[in-house]
């Protein structure tokens, strides 16, 4: 099969480019040797029906034939010549095919394109899942569910294209100005059913956008497998018309007309070739007109079966296999062609010869089996095609119904949208008119606002005058309180300065007592130093004698031992060097061994890694070779399979792509519907939000009413508090008057002032609390006012919006119904109400602004008071913090200075040690760096190798994964192929079993016939033998004759039976042909019914259009109804809201009037307050006079204090002089003590050397004694000399012991003296610390006094300025109020406003405020000078005491060194104790 198909492919390729007229001759030459069978005629008939279906669905013979025939590509440029008179399909087909084309031609004028293109789109939708080959392979077809999925995908793609086009059109419309009356929708059914309007319909655009669909995969029924022939009457261009994309379905005007001529043209159109190795080709030569007729009928049948969606390949394949078998039997069983008997060819040689029974039975059985198989195959194929068409129609009906419902919903929604858009345009017009009206109203409002501003300016000028009066009153009260506080601060500072003077005198007395004690201690120390010097002179004389004796002894020993000691030192040095070198060598050897072990391990690791690399590379190469071999083997195995599967896969890919296109189109449509629904929901949400905003405005109005009521209550509370304060102030004024009259003397006045100050402090606290309450109330009032302003603005905006909306609604409803007129009247009334509301709001704003100005003036006064108080507090806090910081920093700096000196000495020692250590470390580092470089090189190699290993491992893993993937894919392919092969094998087995059963039945019958024949032959032979043996018997002759007669009868009966068999066969064949003709007639009827179905579909489509338009109109109606209902509801809500607002505005007007009345009352009360404050001012001025007298008394006391300070400073200067003289004495003593310490150190060193030399002398004496003993044994004459020497040595030892005892005594005395000096030093330190603390306290007091003086000066300056401002303000107020004096006197109480003079004389204030001269007699300046002198004197004392402590510390250290030397000589283990004892006083001094 494959070889034949390949040869035929080559033939068709060679013929594809040749002219059409040469095709029939070539086909006759190639096909002339083959015989045509009836089943091949059926295939031709099926193909012709497919052609007719192509005409009916596509409307263009060229395109339909290309779609129907071009898929297999096996018969290029072949054309059928069918006679219309002889064809049985001709008259019937004219109603379907020719009638359709006639209708097409008639309707081409105006509506041809629309109807044809609608039909083209519908046929496109139906033919998308039916374009694939039916006879490609033996595998079973896709189930019906997959067919539906394919159709859905194709639809989705089409809908996606429509969506894209709609988006483009929508953009173009948005850029261009849209006409008003044009009804246009993005979901237009005409646009959907007219694909020429789409940009995708053009071949250029589609080839650009759908170039990925250009594949060489065939579609449609494979005509070559049906055994079609082509005969040409007309010539057509032979360009390829493979359907690559949706653009190729574009309809064209039909150029030809006629019954079967169009079918011939369709079959004869150019065909494209495809490489399908499994396609079946059967070429048949045209024998007669009946053959052509039957061939055309078979073509139509097969094409109808395939167009109906029959995708079962097995049935058609089985029918073809049966036909092929029949053709082979016919050719084999008939060698010569001389005569034709009932369709069978009989040679001339076989006329007189009858075949045997076996041959006849075999031929009959084979022919019967072939006929049964053909009938079964054809019936099965037609049954499958009809069932598949029915199922496909049912499956298509469901999504079409869904689509229709979706389209209806879409049209209804479009109608609603159009209605809403019309309403929106009208609303925009109304909005523009309303905006113009608003502009006119705004101009009127501006004029009214200007008028109100002029009135407000007048009110502001009056209120500013009131504010200035209030501010002046507040400033006067503040100045009086400040003066009182300053007087109290001055009194306190004077008392503190008196206390400080007393403390300073006490400290002076203490210091004098301490100085006397110091003088006594110094005298005692001088006496002890004198005694020590005498003792040291005696000790020095004794030491000189001992040194002379020692030199005589050492001179003798040095000569003998010098050489020995030098040699010993050299030997020791060499030994030390040796040990050091050995230790270094051992250390280096250990390090080298460790490094070598590391190198060995690294080398081992390197070798191991190299081996792993080699093994991995071998494994890689082996796996690569294996994978390559396996791939080659699998490729060789699968090449044939892949070649077979490529076409199927490509076809499936195209089906999937079409499916995805349809799915995407559906999704986009659904998204459009959802977007439209969302827009409608947004409109509904906007309406709901407007309603909610109205409700919120109502709530805010209600809340503001409540807030206004609360404000009124708070205002009443504030008025009550103000009245109470006025009463308290009057009571205080009366009490002050009583106090002025009672007290005349200064002491009594002071007591009264203190009491009044206490009472005033309480009043100030009370007033401060009241101020806080007022501030809180004012802040709340401010916030409420801001909220009211915001609410008013929002109300204005809401009113403007509502007025605009009402006017829009009025105009819409005026156009549509009489109800709108009623609404217009209501909106006019609402406008008037809104204007009233606006006017009321303007009045409210004016009142609120006036109230706000009053509140701001009060706030400013309160804020200024707070700011001054906070500023003074913050300055005091900052000064205190700076003092504390300075003292802490001074202490920390002193501690750090001492610590740094200690650290410096330690660091110098450590640096010397580190330099020596660094040199040794640098040498070792150089050696280690050299070694490290080698190790680094090895490590880099290791890292590179490990990375290479990792990369190789990754490559191996990737290759293994790829191999596994390839193996799994190949396994899956093999499984698929195995399943296909098993299904094919099962079918072949079933056919083989049926064939074997038939052959076994026939073989049994043949065996029975042969057995009977052999039996008869045996009987005949016996009879012949008997006849030859006994020819004389007449009886036998008679029997033989009878048998011969019977034989002749049997032969005749056999001939008759054979004739009957032939008649039966011819009858069955005639019946088969009749049944086929009936089937063809039924198929023609089916085609006619399908034509009727198409007409019904057209009518249904028109019904759909009408239904969509109906839904559109219904949507418009529903939209209008919804908008009307919403307008009515909105209108009712607005009416209720306006009624509520009117009521609220009436209430607000009443409240505003009440607020105005209250404000007038408040202004009257404020005037009364101002008058009361003026009275209190006069009283305060009287109090200021009394304060001045107190200031004079304070100055007298300051003069007394100055005198005391001067006396104290003189006494301190004398004490300083005495201290300086004593410090000089102490310095001289310290110098002498230092010299003594140096000498003691030298003596101690000499004693230590002497002790070492004595030890050496003793050892040498022992050696000499040994030598003398030996010499005495040899020379007894030298014994007397030795005894003399011994006696001398004993005497020297006794002298040394006496010297040691004397040294011990001197050490004990030195210890006692040191302890005494340490105690005196500690007492001096404690006294110095006390003096320093006293100095710090005096410094603090000085700073406090300076700060207080500066504050007093500043306060006096501010008082003067305030008094001057008050005078000016009061004079101006008096000048302004001369004219309306009568009115003010009638309204205000009887107390007139007077401008009293400043109680403090100006000359005195100027003297106070002037900066002090160079030599002034003011008490503060003298105090400052005294404090500075005291500070300088205390600093000098502190320095002297520090120098004294340093000298004492140095003398003690020198004494300790002097005592340490003899102590070491006498007690070698007692050094630690002495050292510890000496270290204690040093630490104490250092501290």
Curated annotation (Swiss-Prot):
Cleaved by caspases in apoptotic cells. Residues 358-1454 form a coiled coil. Residues 172-257 are annotated as: Golgi-targeting domain. It is found in: Cytoplasm; Golgi apparatus, Golgi stack membrane. One of its GO terms (biological process) is cell differentiation. Keywords: Acetylation, Coiled coil, Cytoplasm, Developmental protein, Differentiation, Golgi apparatus, Membrane, Phosphoprotein, Spermatogenesis. Its main location: cytoplasm. One of its GO terms (cellular component) is endoplasmic reticulum-Golgi intermediate compartment. Residues 62-74 have a biased composition (Polar residues). Residues 1-118, 221-321, 365-394, 785-804, 1372-1396, 1458-1487 are annotated as: Disordered. The modification N-acetylmethionine is found at residue 1. The keyword Protein transport does not apply. Plays an important role in spermatogenesis and/or testis development. Probably identical with the serologically detectable male antigen (SDM). Probably involved in maintaining Golgi structure. Extended rod-like protein with coiled-coil domains. Homodimer. Interacts with GOLGA7. Interacts with GOPC. This is Golgin subfamily A member 3. The lineage of its organism: Eukaryota, Metazoa, Chordata, Craniata, Vertebrata.
